[in-house]
């Protein structure tokens, strides 16, 4: 069984053009994500999946591996699946999808998210949740919230605050979804064959496709947050976090 991290990376963006190549404390953001992924103990390989030669060039410059994918991929997950096939991954081989805008994530997150699949490939798909400590993230639609059952299976993901405390007198954690997924190649093949879901279209969240079609997502609660770079002004905050590490 192989465990390969694939980092989908797009050059074009309406909010942040060339984001993967933005410098974070002197290194391209994609390099920082790549290096952290490679540091996970469970990983047997790392690759960047992109449709842009500029990103391929940047990755190869720091000694990384890049896979060119079609520019017709409808989502980052489809791009990851295409790259996985190009890399020769099949069956119960595990693909870890790490978003390319998380330059300070802890490598332990990859070991945590892959553990259920390594133990039981029939699990299919896993992801991470983090108990929110910053109140702003409770209501910010950029931070996706999630709920899961007593066995850790995801029930829903939303940009809204869930669950809603109607009476305002309950003590409970609100969980933020972190953009790290692991799947078997068999699961990815099924997922990518499905039409876009109705809830997926509304919330603009790919993972809802799995839930809408009855495919389970096992949730692992992690102690490690994974702040994202959404806009250029986020870089200073990320660089400050790097100094503290």
From Swiss-Prot:
Keywords assigned: Cytoplasm, Lipopolysaccharide biosynthesis, Nucleotidyltransferase, Transferase
User: What biological processes does GO assign it?
Assistant: CMP-keto-3-deoxy-D-manno-octulosonic acid biosynthetic process; lipopolysaccharide biosynthetic process
Give the Gene3D superfamilies listed for this entry: Spore Coat Polysaccharide Biosynthesis Protein SpsA, Chain A (3.90.550.10)
Look up the signal peptide feature and give its range: none
Does the entry feature the keyword Transcription, yes or no? no
Determine if Zinc-finger is one of this entry's keywords.
no
Listed transmembrane segments: none
| Pfam families, sorted | CTP_transf_3
GO cellular component: a single term: cytosol
Enzyme Commission code(s) on record = 2.7.7.38
Pathway stated in the Swiss-Prot or TrEMBL entry: Nucleotide-sugar biosynthesis; CMP-3-deoxy-D-manno-octulosonate biosynthesis; CMP-3-deoxy-D-manno-octulosonate from 3-deoxy-D-manno-octulosonate and CTP: step 1/1; Bacterial outer membrane biogenesis; lipopolysaccharide biosynthesis
PANTHER family assigned to the protein according to its UniProt record, in alphabetical order: 3-DEOXY-MANNO-OCTULOSONATE CYTIDYLYLTRANSFERASE (PTHR42866), 3-DEOXY-MANNO-OCTULOSONATE CYTIDYLYLTRANSFERASE, MITOCHONDRIAL (PTHR42866:SF2)
Which function does this protein serve? Activates KDO (a required 8-carbon sugar) for incorporation into bacterial lipopolysaccharide in Gram-negative bacteria.
Q: What is this protein called?
A: 3-deoxy-manno-octulosonate cytidylyltransferase
Write the lineage as a comma-separated list.
Answer: Bacteria, Pseudomonadati, Thermodesulfobacteriota, Desulfobacteria, Desulfobacterales
């Amino acid at each position: 069984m192989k465990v390969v991290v694939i980092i989908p990376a797009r050059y074009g963006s309406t909010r942040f053009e060339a984001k993967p190549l933005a410098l974070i404390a002197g290194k391209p953001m994609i390099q920082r994500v790549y290096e952290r992924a490679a540091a996970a103990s469970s990983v047997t390989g790392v690759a960047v999946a992109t449709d842009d030669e500029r990103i391929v060039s940047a990755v190869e410059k720091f000694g990384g591996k890049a896979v060119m994918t079609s520019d017709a991929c409808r989502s980052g997950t489809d791009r990851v699946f295409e790259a996985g096939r190009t890399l020769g991954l099949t069956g119960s081989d595990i693909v870890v999808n790490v978003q390319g805008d998380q330059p300070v994530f802890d490598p332990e997150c990859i070991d945590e998210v892959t553990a259920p699949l390594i133990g039981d490939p029939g699990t299919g798909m896993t992801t991470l949740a983090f108990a929110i400590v910053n109140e702003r993230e409770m209501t910010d639609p950029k931070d996706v919230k999630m709920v899961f059952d007593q066995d850790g299976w995801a029930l829903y993901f939303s940009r809204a605050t869930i669950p809603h405390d109607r009476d305002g007198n309950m003590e409970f954690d609100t969980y933020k979804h972190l953009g790290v997924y692991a799947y078997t190649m068999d699961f990815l093949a099924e997922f990518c064959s499905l039409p876009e879901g109705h809830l997926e279209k509304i919330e603009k969240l790919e993972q809802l496709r799995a839930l809408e079609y009855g495919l389970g997502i096992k949730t692992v609660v992690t102690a490690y947050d994974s702040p994202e770079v959404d806009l250029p002004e986020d870089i200073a905050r990320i660089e400050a976090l790097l100094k503290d590490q």
